């Protein structure tokens, strides 16, 4: 380190440090090279690009577009990092240290970004734009399988329709993805695995039936008795035969697509509209939970 005649301190900027700081927190590398405003613009550009990507991916139902635009987003981030590296190379070795070119300032800015700014951005994104969810089970097979990572949009204020996929949250804070089978005012029942709504059979091409075993009565379905269309002296509902029940106001009946192996509304009871937290849109990543193999054919696929 050397002092010039005008008492300014000069110190070379190292490109690898600029890159490292930029990877730690977008824009931090620019602070290191004396361009904090440029770093802030880079951070805002990346946040805006991320939000735009999420919004577009939910409205453009093309796997190719979703994957390609994601790599464009990665390119934006790489461009911000590369810009900090370029500035470090250009200004070295005659860089004049600023008052903020100190280790504790970098540490403070990193903590601010990691524990304040990024969580705030994530909260805004999950509330207004969308969030990522890992689906761990097979209740929705074949539509959604274990190991699928989904992008979920906040649920619209309008009530969900029959056949729509929804994310709902139970009293313990656990999220589930299931399909709306009946809405308020509907009369729903099941006869020999076939769902009927208002007396008419429902076309369900997404449903899988894989179990041909017996169909014993299930005591977990006793909640249905208070919603029966008419009183039944010895009501013995089972997985494949139950109802008819009337869906009350502000209630929804949700079922899993893996109909023979799904712990859904038949057993849990009805879901209230206040429990709906989102709508799954598409699979952004998929990995087999056992082998760890990436399922490339599922990435970018819409779920309906």
Positions of the model-derived regions?
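N-terminal signal-anchor/start-transfer transmembrane helix
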Residues: 19-31
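Soluble "head" domains of membrane/secretory-pathway proteins
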Residues: 2-11, 16, 21, 36, ...
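Transmembrane helix recognition focused on a "late"/terminal membrane span
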Residues: 2-18, 41-128
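Alpha-helical hydrophobic/aromatic positions enriched in membrane-embedded helices and signal peptides
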Residues: 26, 75, 248-249
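Membrane-interface helix starts
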Residues: 32-41
